[in-house]
Amino acid sequence: MATPQQPLLTKTHKQNSIISFKILTFVVTLFVALFLVVFLVAPYQFEIKHSNLCKTAQDSQLCLSYVSDLMSNEIVTTDSDGLSILMKFLVNYVHQMNNAIPVVSKMKNQINDIRQEGALTDCLELLDQSVDLVSDSIAAIDKRTHSEHANAQSWLSGVLTNHVTCLDELDSFTKAMINGTNLDELISRAKVALAMLASVTTPNDDVLRPGLGKMPSWVSSRDRKLMESSGKDIGANAVVAKDGTGKYRTLAEAVAAAPDKSKTRYVIYVKRGIYKENVEVSSRKMKLMIVGDGMHATIITGNLNVVDGSTTFHSATLAAVGKGFILQDICIQNTAGPAKHQAVALRVGADKSVINRCRIDAYQDTLYAHSQRQFYRDSYVTGTIDFIFGNAAVVFQKCKLVARKPGKYQQNMVTAQGRTDPNQATGTSIQFCNIIASSDLEPVLKEFPTYLGRPWKKYSRTVVMESYLGGLINPAGWAEWDGDFALKTLYYGEFMNNGPGAGTSKRVKWPGYHCITDPAEAMPFTVAKLIQGGSWLRSTGVAYVDGLYD
């Protein structure tokens, strides 16, 4: 039998148990609430806080999901600013590309088809370049200046172009091959990186002054002399001559012997003659200048083409990727002819490159202005279909663009610009140029219509301004690529042109076509704005105008 105290003691023990249980429940509830705040509410607040970071993305939800992934992996925090998030995103992007390289290399080694092997070789080269470009972009963004922001936008635009080029090369092959390269993911990340960069503002530390079309006084005496001198008087580091009077007999040998990642200008002088070879200036060959005895005297010639098994990318007689490349007083040609379809004479993917007083001859796809910032001056470019194409930020000044007689039933297209995203800082600008017919086309103009361009990609962007347009230009001015593809998203413009082909009354009525009357609308396509020429062309010594004549 229980004593009188026992019920009281039992009741007290139960009360203590209840109190303990309530405390435990409260603590558990508190931890659950904290968990929800940290892992559910915080990311939501983070997403709201950084929604502006994705405001220009084509797929804003995908962009935000990438940002959320960075937070969930504790790579960034809710306090991280936009630039810090972008840099972490790019570091992760480099890892993804490095992971893709051995996969693509293994695919290439397992393939016996020469065309597929060639396409994968191109992809490997482009992936390797892209890793460097993204790494350079991270360093540029970290400096947080307007000029470095522009550099990063150019380089990241090039990365997206590289991925799309790889996709284009593989497009005719199996879907499994494309999936194996992880290209779709890499392209998505490149677009998101550009969108993030576009949303971040930086202080404007550049003051771009209008140029006067002459060499600036601040150019070093050596660089000015290089641009003004003839080849034989230039004081070259290496000389190429077919007759053995130079150190090298081929340009390819001289380029291979040039120093890697040079900090100063390295000059190769190529004596007059016809050199049958294909030459590549790799990304390691920086600040390289190749100069000849004149566009009619020193000729580099090749005939690689798509019909005979080459890729468009690797059909180039001369390809240049190394930053700061200069080509002067030389003819580059591809003699494959119109029946061989795509056959590139010159491909340029070198940032801050200059082509001065050169002749570039071929038929279809003559000049592949592939990517990065480029400037062409006093040069002569001939071709038929899409004879200036690619996705560089490129300005032509005082050049002659000459349409040739194409193959039967073909039409001439001066340009085919390949911008794939509105955040890419790319486009083709033709200023102070003459667009004319060759002597063999002139008698048969009615048989072979010539257009200023057609949209190769969705956001194609080309402006022709302050130029002479010959009577070869069809009154419509511009041609379709495939039905209504890109007609609403492209940007084609004409400003202050003259000549029999310059009338705009019968031009296309597409939403993306602009007959520009306000100089302010034309300014983004000048040397100063499109390629930021005021900050780098001055150091090359080439003559240029960085604004509009008016």
Curated annotation (Swiss-Prot):
The lineage of its organism: Eukaryota, Viridiplantae, Streptophyta, Embryophyta, Tracheophyta. It catalyses: [(1->4)-alpha-D-galacturonosyl methyl ester](n) + n H2O = [(1->4)-alpha-D-galacturonosyl](n) + n methanol + n H(+). The PMEI region may act as an autoinhibitory domain and prevent untimely PME activity during transport. InterPro entries: Invertase/methylesterase_inhib (IPR035513), Pectin_lyas_fold (IPR012334), Pectin_lyase_fold/virulence (IPR011050), Pectinesterase_Asp_AS (IPR033131), Pectinesterase_cat (IPR000070), Pectinesterase_inhib_dom (IPR006501), Pectinesterase_Tyr_AS (IPR018040). GO terms for molecular function: pectinesterase activity; pectinesterase inhibitor activity. Pathway: Glycan metabolism; pectin degradation; 2-dehydro-3-deoxy-D-gluconate from pectin: step 1/5. Keywords: Aspartyl esterase, Cell wall, Cell wall biogenesis/degradation, Disulfide bond, Fruit ripening, Glycoprotein, Hydrolase, Secreted, Signal, Zymogen. Its EC number is 3.1.1.11. Disulfide bonds join C331-C358, C399-C433. SMART domains: PMEI (SM00856). The active site is at D365, D386. GO terms for cellular component: extracellular region. This is Pectinesterase 2.2. Pectinesterase may play a role in cell wall metabolism during fruit growth and development prior to ripening and may be required for preparing cell walls for softening by polygalacturonase during fruit ripening. It holds the Pfam family PMEI. Glycans are attached at N179. GO terms for biological process: cell wall modification; fruit ripening; pectin catabolic process. Gene3D superfamilies: Invertase/pectin methylesterase inhibitor family protein (1.20.140.40), Single-stranded right-handed beta-helix, Pectin lyase-like (2.160.20.10). Substrate binds at T312, Q342, R454, W456. In the N-terminal section; belongs to the PMEI family. In the C-terminal section; belongs to the pectinesterase family. It comes from Solanum lycopersicum.
